[in-house]
Amino acid sequence: MPAGACELPSGHCTGSHARLTLCYRYAKNDITPKTAPRMTFFSVLLALIIEQVRALSPSNPVFALFQFHAETVAHGLDAGKQKHGLLAWLAVVLPWVLIVALIYFLLYKVSFVLAFLWNVAVVYFTLGFRQFSHYFTDIHLALNNDDVPRAREILHEWTGIDTVDMPVGEIVRHTLIHAVVASHRHVFGVFFWYVLPLGPAGAVLYRISEYLARSWSTPGEDRTAAFSTFAQRAFFVIDWIPSRLTALGFAIVGNFEDAIYAWRNHTRQWPDPNDGVLLAAGSGALGARLAGPLAEPSSLDALAVGDSGPLTVGDDCTPRTLQSAVGLVWRAVILWMILLLMLTLAVWVS
C-alpha cells in the first residue's frame, strides 16, 4: 500500500465510494474505535504523575469559582423543601458537566492531542490525591517522632473532631477511617466515572456530586436539613458501584479473607452503606480494628466518633498500621492501572 494511504480495518465494505468515505472519516477522527481507551489510560497516568510532582492547591481558582457557584445557588434556592434541593443540584451539576463535555467534543474535532490534554487537565483537577494525603503523612511523621500533641493538632485540622487527650491508638484509628474514605472519593471514584463513556464529564459529575453531598449537609444557620436530601441521595446512587469496586480492590491487594468477611458481616455497623462497605473491607484488608459507629448517616465526622466497639477482625491500630495503609492504597492504584492497561491492550490488538 502506498505511503500515506488509508488502511481500513478488515470487515469494512470494499466499494470504491465507500472506501473513500471511510478513509475521509478516519482521517477526520470521526471513527475512533481505539483512541478512547488509549486516551483514558495515558491521561490518568499522566495526571497521577503531575499530581504527585505538583499537588493542586485546594484554593485553586477553578475550585474557588465552582464553590462560589455552588454556594450562590444554595443560598438562592434553599427554601426548606426537598424539591428546592433537586433544582439546586441540577443548576450546579448540569452546567459544569455539559461545558466539560462540550469542550472535549470540540477539541476532539480539532485535534486528538488537544482533547488528550483536556482530559489530563480534568483528571488532574478532579483527583485530589495530595489534597488529603499530606494530612495523613504529617500525622504519620508526628507519631514516628513521638510528637503526639502535633498529631492531635493535625487530625483536628483535617477532620474537625475533638482530639484533646486522644490516645495514640485512637489517633491512628480516626486517621485510617478518614484516609480510607478519602482515598476512594479522591482517587478510585474519579477513576471509575472517568473510565465510563462519559469520560471527563463523568469525572466532573462524581467530584461535584461528592462535594455537594458533603457541603450542603454541613449544618449552618442558612442551610436547612431538607435541602441537602437530594444531594445525599444522588451521591449515594452515583457512588454505589465505585465504592464496592474500591472495596473489592482493597480485598484483592490486602487480606482477602478478612476483607470479605468484614464486608459481609460488619458493613451494617456503619451508618452510611457505601462508606460502610469501604471501611469494613478496608479494616479486614489492613488487619486493623476500626470502630463501627451508630451515628448520623452520611457524616464522615460521625463515622469517626462512634462507641459501638471495634470490628472483630484484625489487631489494634498502631502507627505501623498507617504505613500498611499507604501500601494498601498504592497497591490498589496499581491494580486499577493494570486493569486499565489490559483494557487498552485488548482494544489495541482487537
Please identify what each model-predicted range represents.
Residues 33-350:
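Hydrophobic N-terminal alpha-helices or hydrophobic patches in metabolic proteins across all domains
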